[in-house]
Amino acid sequence: MTKHIAILRGDGIGPEIVAETVRVLDKLIEQGLDAGYEYAPLGGEAYDEYGHPYPEFTQNLCRKADAVLLGAVGSPQYDNLDRPLRPERGLLAIRKDLNLFANLRPAVLYPELANASTLKPEIVAGLDILIVRELTGDIYFGEPRGIRVLENGEREGYNTMKYSESEIRRIAHVAFQSAQKRSKKVCSVGKANVLETTELWREIFEEIGKEYPDVELSHMYVDNAAMQLVRAPKQFDVIATGNIFGDILSDEASMLTGSLGMLPSASLDENGKGLYEPSHGSAPDIAGQNKANPLATILSLAMLLRYSLNDEA
C-alpha cells in the first residue's frame, strides 16, 4: 500500500535543503519504495499565501499523510506579526494538531567532526545520546497564560507549567522502549526539588520503570544535567525530560557534536506517525546562496522511513 508523505519546505534555507532531500526520496521511489508525496506551506511561506502559519490546506494534507517532512520555519521579517501568526506558531500548531508528543533528538559525534566540538576529543569521542522530549504539554501550552496589568499599574507576564499523569506515562514508555534498543539507561531530568510538576514526573517514571527491569533508571535536576552534559556527556544514554527543559538540553547536546547542522529529529504520535525535520533552524542569513548543508534533512528522511514507513532504505 502506497504511503503518503506531506512535504513542508518552510522558510529560509528550508526550500533548498528540502529540494536536495527530495532528490534522495525520488531515487528511493525509483528503486522500489512504495511512497508518494505532496507539498504544502508552513510558517512564513504559509502566512504569505494564506494569512496563517498553519492553514487549513496544510492541516488537511498533514492529517491524511503517513508522515511529514519539514525543512525549517522562521524569518526575521515576521517578527513583528501578532504572536499567533508568527511562523514558529505554525510549528507548535502542527505538533499539537497531530498529537506529536514525543520528540527524539539524537546527538551523535561523527569522527570527522571530533575537532569541531568545543570540548576535548577525549570527552566527546564516541558520543551517542538520545534526548526524548515531551512536546505537547508543559509551560509552552499550559493555561492560563498572558500579560496582565496589576492593580498598581505594573505589567506582569505569567505562564502555567503542568503535566497530566497520562502525558507523563506515554512519554515514559517511549523513553524506556528507546533505551531497550540502545545501552539500556534512562536519565529522567526535571526540577522535583522545587516544581510539583516534575515531582509527579519523577514518581511516574519510577512506576513505569518497574515494567522495564532491564533498563537502569536515574534522576537528575536540570541544572546539574546541563552541567554534566558539558563535564561528562558520555555518561548519558537516553535523557527523558519535559518540553521546556528538553528544548534547552537538546540544543546544548547537539553542539557537543560539533555542528547542529548535521543532526536530524523526529516527533511522533502514539501510532508511529511523525514529523521529521533537521535540528537546525532556517538560517535566513544564508538562504538562497546554495551553501546550506542538507545532510540533517536527509537523515531526517532516513528517520521517517524507519519510524513511520517501517523501511530501512
Curated annotation (Swiss-Prot):
Q: Which HAMAP family match?
A: LeuB_type1 (MF_01033)
Q: Where is this site: Important for catalysis?
A: Y140, K191
Q: Which SUPFAM superfamilies match?
A: Isocitrate/Isopropylmalate dehydrogenase-like (SSF53659)
UniProt: Mg(2+) binding residues: D223, D247, D251
Obligatory cofactor(s): Mg(2+); Mn(2+)
Q: Where does substrate bind?
A: R95, R105, R133, D223
Q: Name one GO molecular function term.
A: NAD binding
Cofactor: how and how many bound: Binds 1 Mg(2+) or Mn(2+) ion per subunit.
Q: Which PANTHER family match?
A: 3-ISOPROPYLMALATE DEHYDROGENASE
Species of origin reads Neisseria lactamica
Pathway membership: Amino-acid biosynthesis; L-leucine biosynthesis; L-leucine from 3-methyl-2-oxobutanoate: step 3/4
Q: What does this protein do?
A: Catalyzes the oxidation of 3-carboxy-2-hydroxy-4-methylpentanoate (3-isopropylmalate) to 3-carboxy-4-methyl-2-oxopentanoate. The product decarboxylates to 4-methyl-2 oxopentanoate.
Query: An example of a Gene Ontology BP annotation on this entry?
Result: L-leucine biosynthetic process
- Positions binding NAD(+) in this chain are G281, S282, A283, P284, D285, I286, A287, G288, Q289, N290, K291, A292, N293
Q: Which UniProt keywords apply?
A: Amino-acid biosynthesis, Branched-chain amino acid biosynthesis, Cytoplasm, Leucine biosynthesis, Magnesium, Manganese, Metal-binding, NAD, Oxidoreductase
- Which SMART domains does this UniProt record tie to the protein? Iso_dh (SM01329)
Starting at the broadest rank, the lineage of the source organism is: Bacteria, Pseudomonadati, Pseudomonadota, Betaproteobacteria, Neisseriales
Q: Which family does it belong to?
A: Belongs to the isocitrate and isopropylmalate dehydrogenases family. LeuB type 1 subfamily.
Q: Which InterPro entries match?
A: IsoCit/isopropylmalate_DH_CS, IsoPropMal-DH-like_dom, Isopropylmalate_DH
Query: What is the gene called?
Result: leuB
Main location (coarse class): cytoplasm
Q: What is the recorded name of this protein?
A: 3-isopropylmalate dehydrogenase
Give the UniProt subcellular location, in the record's own words: Cytoplasm
- What's one GO-annotated cellular component? cytosol
E.C. code: 1.1.1.85
User: How does the annotation summarize its subunit structure?
Assistant: Homodimer.
- Mention any Pfam family matching this sequence: Iso_dh
